[in-house]
């Protein structure tokens, strides 16, 4: 079954709603150099991580200036996993993986022919849509990309692939059917307004992402 990560949680209320909806992972954005309404302070990130119950994965989402800074941030927040954004060299991603106790996810851009170079040094690849001027390089574009191409990419690499970019309750079932990803990631697609989740949309997204297809209809 495809796993679900609800990302960009900023409050305890939204965090609790994602957990109650059955999300497998919760994404908490901290210490990024781009403007986003989904970023929280390191202190809030630590508190939300601490509020994450057993069997739900807390994911620290960050865009580090240096690999050493990423390692320090992981030690401070103590997440179950860390997701790295930005133009981080492969060697720096490998450094983070070697010096942190948690799995490392590297965000890559859909269509980037060199993205597979990270596959041997991290634990998963998150394939997101190309950045817009508003979103910068930190995701949250609200735009989908070529899912068939991402499916082909996922088939080429041994590393688990997380699908992101423009996913909503309305399209996530089709996305899962097309890509068959290890997991899907949603942020803006389940928001009432930037930085605030629509709890009904979160529940609908999780339900549709994890629904078992009826074999009689295939």
Swiss-Prot record:
Q: Does the keyword Amino-acid biosynthesis apply?
A: yes
Does the keyword Isomerase belong to this entry? Answer: yes
Q: Which SUPFAM superfamilies match?
A: Ribulose-phoshate binding barrel (SSF51366)
Its pathway is: Amino-acid biosynthesis; L-tryptophan biosynthesis; L-tryptophan from chorismate: step 3/5
Instruction: List the disulfide bonds in this chain.
Output: none
Query: What is this enzyme's EC?
Result: 5.3.1.24
Q: Which reaction does it catalyse?
A: N-(5-phospho-beta-D-ribosyl)anthranilate = 1-(2-carboxyphenylamino)-1-deoxy-D-ribulose 5-phosphate
Which terms are listed as keywords in the entry?
A: Amino-acid biosynthesis, Aromatic amino acid biosynthesis, Isomerase, Tryptophan biosynthesis
Q: Mind listing the GO molecular function terms for this protein?
A: phosphoribosylanthranilate isomerase activity
One Gene Ontology BP term is:
L-tryptophan biosynthetic process
Gene3D superfamilies, alphabetized: Aldolase class I
Mention any Pfam family matching this sequence. PRAI
Q: Which family does it belong to?
A: Belongs to the TrpF family.
The protein's name in its UniProt record: N-(5'-phosphoribosyl)anthranilate isomerase
Q: Name the lineage.
A: Archaea, Methanobacteriati, Methanobacteriota, Stenosarchaea group, Halobacteria
């Amino acid at each position: 079954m495809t796993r679900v990560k609800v990302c960009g949680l900023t409050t305890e209320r939204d965090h609790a709603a994602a957990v109650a909806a059955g999300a497998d992972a919760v994404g908490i954005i901290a210490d990024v150099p781009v403007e986003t309404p989904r970023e929280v302070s390191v202190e809030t990130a630590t508190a939300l991580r601490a509020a994450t119950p057993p069997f739900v994965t807390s994911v620290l989402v960050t865009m580090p200036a240096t690999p050493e800074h990423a390692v320090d941030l992981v030690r401070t927040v103590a997440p179950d996993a860390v997701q790295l954004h930005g133009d981080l060299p492969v060697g720096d991603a490998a450094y983070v993986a070697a010096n942190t106790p948690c799995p490392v996810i590297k965000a890559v851009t859909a269509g980037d022919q060199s993205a597979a170079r990270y596959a041997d040094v991290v634990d998963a690849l998150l394939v997101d849509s190309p950045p817009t001027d508003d979103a910068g390089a930190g995701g949250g574009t609200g735009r989908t990309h070529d899912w068939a191409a991402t499916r082909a990419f996922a088939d080429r690499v041994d590393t688990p692939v997380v699908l992101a970019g423009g996913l909503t309750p309305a399209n996530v079932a089709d996305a899962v059917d097309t890509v068959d990803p290890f997991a899907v990631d949603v942020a803006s697609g389940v928001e009432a307004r930037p930085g605030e989740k629509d709890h009904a949309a979160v529940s609908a997204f999780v339900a549709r992402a994890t629904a078992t297809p009826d074999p009689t209809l295939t």
